Amino acid sequence: MARALLGTKVGMTQIWSGRRVVPVTAVAVTTNVVSQVKAPEKDGYSRLQIATGAIDPRRVNRPRKGHFAKAGLTPRRFIREVDSEGSLGDEFGPEIFQEGQLVDVVGKSKGKGFSGTMKRHNFQGVSATHGSHRNHRKPGSVGASSTPSRVFKGTRMAGRLGSSRVTVHNLRLVKIDSENGLLLVEGAVPGSSGSPVIIRDAVKGVPIVS
């Protein structure tokens, strides 16, 4: 099973790695704790629920307070489920990873609001001239005529863009800064600054050529 850690995105910077400058995303990581173990017999599937982040107890609602009290833990800010192994109450941090390994990062992308087909689906658009009149950014036809007399499900149209779960595969873990509780991951990571992200072992495991 893949090892996984829950942290928060800090932002992007760049560091020197050998003779080249590497763009990295800093992810703040504090101690993670297993707050629940999902079992097939009771829940129908097998997962670990991990939690992290400090939160003012006055801001925790009663159901969540009861959930953590049942596990014998103080409330945490973020909760996520991961496909990993462990026992209730287990604590772990950045030490589960090694510098240079490949990881997958899961986060929620920034919301862009209602967007047209050119921005949302990279449609080409309509010609700027040659008789085109106020159709420049329209999607064009969305289906045939009397057959089938409907628009097929899944047809790409305008709609809300972003604010969805995104996984970026095979990013290199450049540096582990245990003193400051930071993981530096090469490249961009989904989400805005302060949003929770899951860092896990790369499931595809493609070797990286340095």
From Swiss-Prot:
InterPro entries: Ribosomal_uL3, Ribosomal_uL3_bac/org-type, Ribosomal_uL3_CS, Transl_B-barrel_sf. One of its GO terms (molecular function) is rRNA binding. Residues 126-150 are annotated as: Disordered. GO terms for cellular component: cytosolic large ribosomal subunit. Pfam families: Ribosomal_L3. One of its GO terms (biological process) is translation. It comes from the Bacteria. Belongs to the universal ribosomal protein uL3 family. Part of the 50S ribosomal subunit. Forms a cluster with proteins L14 and L19. One of the primary rRNA binding proteins, it binds directly near the 3'-end of the 23S rRNA, where it nucleates assembly of the 50S subunit. This is Large ribosomal subunit protein uL3. It comes from Tropheryma whipplei (strain Twist) (Whipple's bacillus). The lineage of its organism: Bacteria, Bacillati, Actinomycetota, Actinomycetes, Micrococcales. The gene is rplC.
